[in-house]
Amino acid sequence: MATIFSPIDMHVPPNFIVDVHSVLTGEDFDQLVRDNPELRMELSATGELILMSPTGSKTGLRNAELNRQLGNWAKTNRSGVVFDSSTLFVLPNGARRSPDVSWVKLERWNALSVEEQEGFAPLCPDFVIELRSRSDNLPPLEDKMLEYIANGAQMAWLIDPVRKRVYIYRPNRTAEILEDPQTVSGDLELAGFKLDVRELW
């Protein structure tokens, strides 16, 4: 099935979406990703294949800063592990997602087999961050944050440098919106973690 797109040589618009539920299973998608490592792809729970364009330089810089700050905290805290945007997770609803930044509790990570750790981990991270770029429409990102929470994330942040807002999602609560904050606290979910948002604006 992966040979439909491999080798791939075509031009697609940013965040190109095509419904493949009738021709591509989750396992087919996993193989497609392995066969095309140069592409960043996701698969929705309803079978939509999403081809995502590379980030611009400014967005890449912001992503690196997010990973640096969360990674520094995680190295000291040692209660979990951090992943960058190249990591694909298989969520309980069947979606394949690659959050910009994510964190998984150490006990959940250690409970995976070696094969699961080496492949696409079958879990939803405990904490995720998505960073909006100028080309991103906001509603699909908001839907993605709700999906993370519905699949087991304890907290999810949507950071919008365009509007200088941070949306905080938690289970069984409406999203909290912070307007132009200087810092955002991890509170109980990530005790001691405080993101310096000024580095992202």
Model features per residue range: what roles?
Residues 1-201:
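Gly/Pro/Ser/Thr-rich low-complexity, intrinsically disordered segments predominantly at protein N-termini
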